[in-house]
């Protein structure tokens, strides 16, 4: 009886180790292509397990969640995934492309980044720049230039498209006062 238990336990630990090795390879391949949050890696690995289970025609193993968590902890320990680093890089990138602070926060929250980490990332998004008084105002200007809104429209269209331009900035997550100041700016 004891021998049968030991053989079963040994087989299960080998299966668990093999699953962990496959998951680690999948996670490394994913991280090789994308900088990612912990939650995104977790979702990707769960989808991978479901796909493997469907392909094999077997249900997903009970130990698969534990294997995913073990792989994620190992990746965190080695520094391959770090939510703070991911949030900082993504916040700067989105800020430089003209996204508002509100839109950046929503984007990061949707990817499972903790609110405290999001706050730190939003604070650090302008560290590279010199003395930003209003980072959202600068982002709104970038957005307006990119979308040809407000002062970037032909002069004959500015007055008739003013409300539409303000609405576009509002939908992008900018406040009414920032939208108004950007749309009414002179080039």
Residue ranges and their predicted role:
Residues 2-187:
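An alpha-helical, amphipathic repeat domain used for nucleic-acid recognition
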């Amino acid at each position: 009886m004891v021998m049968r238990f030991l053989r079963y336990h040994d087989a299960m630990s080998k299966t668990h180790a093999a699953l962990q090795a496959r998951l680690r390879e999948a996670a490394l391949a994913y991280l090789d292509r994308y900088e990612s949050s912990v939650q995104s890696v977790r979702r990707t690995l769960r989808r991978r397990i479901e796909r493997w289970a469907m392909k094999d025609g077997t249900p997903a193993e009970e130990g698969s969640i534990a294997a995913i968590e073990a792989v994620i902890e190992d990746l965190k320990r080695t520094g391959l995934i770090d939510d703070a680093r991911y949030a900082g890089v993504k916040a700067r990138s989105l800020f430089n492309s003209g996204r508002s602070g509100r839109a950046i926060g929503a984007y990061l929250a949707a990817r499972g980044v903790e609110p405290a980490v999001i706050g730190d990332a939003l604070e650090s998004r302008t560290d590279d720049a010199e003395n930003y008084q209003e980072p959202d105002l600068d982002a709104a200007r970038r957005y307006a230039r990119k979308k040809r809104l407000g002062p970037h429209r032909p002069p004959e269209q500015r007055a008739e498209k003013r409300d539409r331009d303000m609405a576009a900035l509002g939908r992008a997550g900018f406040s009414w006062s920032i939208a108004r100041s950007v749309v009414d700016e002179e080039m």
